């Protein structure tokens, strides 16, 4: 639907490749993408037991993110969240209520699509945070600190994590791009 949140560098890249010729409407990739979107809309519009609006699930998911995967995280909280999210996501797909039609502009449908995406993104955030057994920047783990200071593990976590979609939001594949430090070496920081 044209809604993107991207790092600045990705936008620059897309700006450079926009000169590629557009795909024809009957191209296999276009047909496949259209069919996938239509199937998703149909699934969203036809929840078996529609009750609450997308905002209800958005609030519940947001509360879990805020309390269990905020700036300060713990293994226990992350594991608990990873048990809660699939249950809430299943409830969302069974019960989300979308008024109106899937054939015209429908802001409730747009919101539901975003919330469905947030479930996948949120779960990935928790998986990544649980796997990163250190405290560094936005990855502060309560069990990895020393005298109140973040305890980094540069030996095991000096990499860029690129998570790959496998078709199951609970089982992404981690691809690591090692970081090399030629000019400036990592050093211990003090926030005191």
Where do the model's predicted regions map?
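Glycine- and aromatic-enriched mobile tails/lids
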Residues: 1-192
């Amino acid at each position: 639907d044209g809604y993107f949140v991207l790092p600045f560098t990705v936008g620059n890249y897309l700006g450079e490749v926009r000169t590629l010729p557009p795909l024809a409407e009957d191209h296999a990739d276009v047909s496949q993408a259209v069919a996938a979107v239509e199937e998703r809309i149909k699934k969203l519009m036809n929840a078996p037991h529609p009750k609450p609006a997308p905002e209800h699930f958005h609030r519940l998911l947001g509360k879990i993110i805020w309390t269990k995967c905020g700036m300060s995280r713990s293994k226990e909280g992350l594991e608990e969240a990873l048990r809660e999210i699939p249950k809430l996501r299943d409830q969302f797909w069974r019960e989300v209520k979308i008024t109106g039609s899937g054939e015209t502009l429908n802001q409730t449908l747009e919101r539901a699509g975003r919330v469905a995406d947030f479930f996948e993104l949120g779960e990935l955030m928790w998986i990544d945070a649980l796997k990163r057994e250190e405290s560094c920047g936005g990855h502060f783990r309560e069990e990895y600190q020393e005298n109140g200071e973040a305890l980094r593990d540069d030996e095991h976590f000096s990499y860029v994590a690129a998570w790959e979609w496998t078709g199951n939001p609970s089982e992404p594949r981690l691809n690591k791009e090692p970081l090399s430090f030629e000019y400036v070496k990592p050093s211990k920081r003090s926030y005191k």
